[in-house]
Regions:
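Short loop/turn elements at sensory-signaling interfaces that couple input to output
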Residues: 1-13
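Sensory beta-strand/linker motifs that couple input domains to effectors
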Residues: 16
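Primarily the dimerization/phosphotransfer
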Residues: 29-71
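Short conserved segment of the HATPase_c
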Residues: 32, 207-221
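Conserved catalytic submotifs in the C-terminal HATPase_c
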Residues: 81, 117-122, 139, 144-154, ...
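Short alpha-helical segment of the dimerization/phosphotransfer core of two-component systems
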Residues: 91-96
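Glycine-rich ATP-binding loops of the HATPase_c
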Residues: 248-254
Length: 275
């Protein structure tokens, strides 16, 4: 109801009544739909977390026992072909555990249950460690990794485990989609606004704007990969973006077909640790 005085010199008022029942009904329906969607999302995330944990437990046993047999700790295995099969079992098991860990982390982030151990992180040191870990993969694919790390870079306040995963995911993606003879350049630098930025640039196949949008959706994969045989679950970039944002960092990606890709993760000045 709206009440207003009539401006004709008299002490008269006008009241206008509006029936807002349809609006209230629509509002109630929207709130209920939102509540149901949130409950469904939470239930999905909880289910993914539980199933990932249940699958990972027996997988660890498979990996562990295959490693024992590969090392022939209790005697020779015999035929060389068996040894190769054991290597395949061990490698595939390790890959599956890695995918499950990604799935578990993403489900925790969506449910708001990811635990972060915030501490001062030396971004340069962590980046160098990740480059060393990814160097064998780069060598196999004949891809060159170059680094350009800023000197006297202040530490950032972040969760070291998730930042390490961010760097490893970005390096793995760049190597995966860069042809033999190509380059991956990893750099750190301070920005004028006080933030610290981590950049991973490659000379790979690149993506169109539409493909970038697809790549950032969980479980979506691009059909134009030069490494089709190495496709994963489509969690790499979505998880990396989610981990960056969980650490209060911004995530951006620029790319063009046949012109490579640039990913930037910027930690704001408020996340700088006192030296």
């Amino acid at each position: 109801m709206t009440i207003g005085k009539i401006s004709d010199g008299t002490d008269r008022f006008c009241a206008i009544f509006r029936d807002i029942t349809p609006w209230k009904k629509s509002e109630s329906e929207l709130l209920n739909a939102k509540r149901v969607a949130e409950q469904a999302s939470s239930a999905k995330s909880d289910f993914l977390a539980k199933i990932s944990h249940e699958i990972r437990t027996p997988l660890n046993a498979i990996i562990g026992f295959s490693e024992v047999m590969m090392d022939e700790r209790f005697g020779p295995v015999g035929n060389e072909r068996y040894k190769q099969y054991l290597k395949d079992i061990h490698t595939s098991g390790g890959h599956l555990v890695s995918l499950l860990n990604d799935l578990l982390d993403l489900s925790k982030i969506e449910a708001g249950k990811l635990e972060l151990n915030i501490a001062a992180v030396d971004l340069n040191e962590l980046t160098q460690q990740c480059v060393a870990l990814m160097q064998p993969q780069a060598n196999r694919e004949r891809v060159i990794i170059r680094t350009s790390l800023a000197t006297s870079l202040p530490p950032v306040l972040a969760d070291a485990r998730s930042v390490r995963q961010i760097v490893l995911n970005l390096l793995s993606n760049s190597i995966k989609f860069t042809g033999a003879g190509g380059q991956v350049i990893v750099s750190t630098a301070p920005n004028d606004d006080g933030s610290i930025v981590l950049r991973v640039r490659d000379t790979g196949v690149g993506m169109s704007e539409k493909e970038i949008a697809i790549a950032l959706e969980p479980f979506r994969q691009l059909a134009t990969s030069i490494r089709r045989g190495q496709d994963g679950t489509g969690l790499g970039l979505p998880l990396t973006k989610a981990l960056a944002e969980a650490n209060r960092a911004s995530f951006s990606i620029k790319s063009a077909v046949n012109a490579g890709t640039l990913v930037e993760v910027a930690f704001p000045g408020s996340r700088m640790a006192a030296e």
